[in-house]
């Protein structure tokens, strides 16, 4: 399992355990699974998907380290 935390300027959007996270990277969509290599990347407009949930975003950043995934995003309203 992954520990996922998604924050926006307004609030904490989600925190909890998930199987995987799909994100809209600036070089294309990609998926984070358990034991993924450490990573820092920018995100572009699109949809973050995790455990059947979808969160539309305008952009942001992702950090992956030791099965902990942190996203700092600007929400699309």
Predicted regions and their residues:
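Compact, glycine-rich, soluble single-domain proteins
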Residues: 2-77
